[in-house]
UniProtKB/Swiss-Prot annotation:
Protein name: Uracil phosphoribosyltransferase
Organism: Roseiflexus castenholzii (strain DSM 13941 / HLO8)
Highest rank taxon of the organism: Bacteria
Activity regulation (UniProt): Allosterically activated by GTP.
Organism classification: Bacteria, Bacillati, Chloroflexota, Chloroflexia, Chloroflexales
Pfam families: UPRTase
Length: 208
């Protein structure tokens, strides 16, 4: 799939192994999610347009550049929250809007319970954030909500995905790039990614 980008960075592979480990404590887990999120952001923003900006250094005038687009972050609650702060560290001017979606454990279908989008679109690029792309239901629903809202450019950033989730998101929204740290083997009968890392939300917030 042309729109699927899986990181090949050695540090991503290293940190992802630590993240997956069952004995990794919540504090370390959060740190690793933060670090991996910044690696993914770097790769997902390589095509950001720039505009010229004139500044003064302590020694002389300088003609530099700044990001030309307004960026919005859309974390899918609750696990997506773990990816917000590290991205804001790099793009502090980004707007943040929350979408609450949970997966019904009986049907494995997404249910929307919270939507904090403003009345009108005021960004050029939306980054949907969710550590896990399992069935793809929540990601598909989130992107659909953003498109109905009027967002024109959308990218998905996730740490680990199952082929089923990637396929579902790509088929529903083929124009949305998918940036991942890893693509795993399959989903089990409970809808969990295998080998995966378990429930990202529980591990982030110590509720498992």
């Amino acid at each position: 799939m042309k729109q699927v980008f899986i990181s090949q960075h050695p540090l991503v592979h290293h940190k992802l192994t630590l993240l997956r480990r069952a004995t990794t404590e919540p504090k370390k887990f959060r740190e690793l999610v933060s670090e991996l999120s910044q690696f993914l952001l770097y790769e997902a923003t390589l095509d950001l347009p720039l505009q010229e900006r004139a500044i003064d250094t302590p020694l002389a005038p300088y003609h530099g550049h700044q990001i030309a687009e307004r960026i919005g972050l859309v974390p899918i609650l609750r696990a997506g929250l773990g990816m917000v702060d590290p991205i804001l560290d790099l793009i502090p001017t980004a707007h943040v809007w929350h979408l609450g979606l949970y997966r019904d454990h009986a049907t494995l279908q997404p249910v929307t319970y919270y939507n904090k989008l403003p009345p009108e679109v005021d960004v050029d690029l939306c980054l949907v954030l969710d550590p896990m792309l399992a069935t793809g239901g929540s990601a598909v629903a989130a992107v659909s909500i953003l498109k109905e809202w009027g967002a024109s450019r959308i990218k998905f950033l996730g740490l680990i995905a199952a082929p089923e989730g990637v396929r579902a998101l790509h088929e529903a929204h083929p124009n949305v790039p998918i940036h991942l740290a890893a693509l795993d083997d399959h989903l089990n009968d409970r809808g969990y990614i295998v080998p995966g890392l378990g429930d990202a939300g529980d591990r982030l917030f110590g509720t498992g």
